[in-house]
Each structure stands twice: as structure tokens, then as C-alpha cells.
């Protein structure tokens, strides 16, 4: 019997898994892979959209984190993943917020004891034994402190999982990627948006708002979603209703800033560790499992 491919995605807050890697997750779950998502906080500091859930916000009832467990559960279901997995257990570390956010009662993720956080992720890696781990780049994508710390913790955990420290049998992760945004495809997708894709109160993103993209020659892999995975990504984004609004055509979404973001059907990656598999004419892998030997993955 062919071995089932296993992939692990590490994210900072509920909704990050859908925004940056939703199509990839749905693509591999549909192919029968064992896909798991680790979320490092409950996203308590998120900016709530609209009045319906406004009282959940941190400066009111401070109940947003618990509510977002339900949103993440629903989003993962749309992507074909099981129950949420929170690093250290649900609520162990609090969303740190953006720079300048005051400390709260519970320990923020950026203040976590690094050995404890790394050890918690090592335990997940050694239990699942993933062939691929996906995290963030050193800037954490757009620079959120929790995203930066996810990079630190994930990088250390991938290295430690294959060594002798921490309990459990070591597992050397074959391939480790960063999830990144590719500048050219993003800009092309923005240019392709039409007024019909947007809500009346949305604006188009400016070049100054998108400074963290990667040039084509710095990209190592792309996962091009089919119609099923793209639809699953849109449904997962809609499940995060306190944080994301999906536009009328399903081709764009917006966060609380009302800046339109194209819902990409391609997601891009940088290979950090491990050997690349076959590449296309752009020099990109088109499968995160490329170069790893599997028989036909079971379908479901």
C-alpha cells in the first residue's frame, strides 16, 4: 500500500491558514493527503468587522478568541481538515497584536518561553511525521509580530525534531517551505479585478500596501488550485466572518481595512530545506511533494 503523504502547516492566527495557504490545503486533502494545521493563538486581538460581533472585541467583552475557535473549525472543515490543533493547547498563548498593543492578562505568543513553544511543535512534528512543513519567512509575511515569532519557532522546531533533544522519536522533515506572496501574480490578479468584484466601501490596494512580495526568481514552488480547491478556499475565508468579507463574485475579499484582496487560485512557496523536485520552465516546482517518492495517493 502506498504511503500517504503528510503535510503540516503552521500559522499564527485563525484565518491565516485560509488567506495564504487555503487552496494548497484543499488541494492536498482532496488528493488524500494527511494535512494538519497548527494555529499558535486564538486571534484575540483581531479587528472585528461590523456591529454583529463588535461586542466580542478585546476592548469590550474580550471574547473574540473563543468565538474564533468556531470560525477556524468551520474553515478547516471546508478545506478538508479535521479539528483545530492549537500550539500548546487552545489559549496557551495569546495573540500579541500589532506593535504597540498593550500586554493583557495572559502571556502573549511573542513572550512565550521559546523552549516550551519549540518543544510543543516538535511534539506535533514527531507525532505526525510530516513529509512537508510550511511556515513563514523571517519577516512573517507582512510583519505581524506573531508571524515573525511563528517563523522563529517553526524553524527551530523543524531542526530540533530531527535531533536528539525533546521527548519522542526524532523525525527529520524532508522538505521545509515558507509560504510567501509572489509580486507579479498578485499584481496581475489585482489588475484583473473589476468593480463587480468589489463591495461599494472597498478600495483597491496600492503599491505601498504590498511591499512584502517575492520576485519570480526567488520563488521555488507554486500550487495551482483547481476549481474545487479554489471554491474551498473561498468558503473557508467566508467562515472567518469576524475578520474577512468575501466579495459578491467570490474573486476578492477584504479585511477590516476594506482593501480588496484577490482570492488567489495559485499559492507560492520558498524551499528552505530539503531537495527540490522537478521544476517547470519558470524554475518552480508545481508540487510541494516533488522529489519525494510516493505511489498514487488514495483519493477520498
From Swiss-Prot:
SUPFAM superfamilies, per the entry: LmbE-like (SSF102588)
Keywords: Hydrolase, Metal-binding, Zinc
Catalysed reactions listed for this entry: 1D-myo-inositol 2-acetamido-2-deoxy-alpha-D-glucopyranoside + H2O = 1D-myo-inositol 2-amino-2-deoxy-alpha-D-glucopyranoside + acetate
InterPro entries per UniProt: GlcNAc_PI_deacetylase-related (IPR003737), LmbE-like_dom_sf (IPR024078), Mycothiol_biosynthesis_MshB (IPR017810)
Cofactor note: Binds 1 zinc ion per subunit.
GO molecular function: N-acetylglucosaminylinositol deacetylase activity; zinc ion binding
Xref: Gene3D superfamilies: LmbE-like (3.40.50.10320)
A GO BP entry: mycothiol biosynthetic process
Cofactor(s) the protein requires to work: Zn(2+)
Residues annotated to bind Zn(2+): 13, 16, 147
EC number: 3.5.1.103
Function: Catalyzes the deacetylation of 1D-myo-inositol 2-acetamido-2-deoxy-alpha-D-glucopyranoside (GlcNAc-Ins) in the mycothiol biosynthesis pathway.
The family this protein is said to belong to: Belongs to the MshB deacetylase family.
HAMAP family: MshB
Name recorded for this polypeptide: 1D-myo-inositol 2-acetamido-2-deoxy-alpha-D-glucopyranoside deacetylase
Organism of provenance: Mycobacterium avium (strain 104)
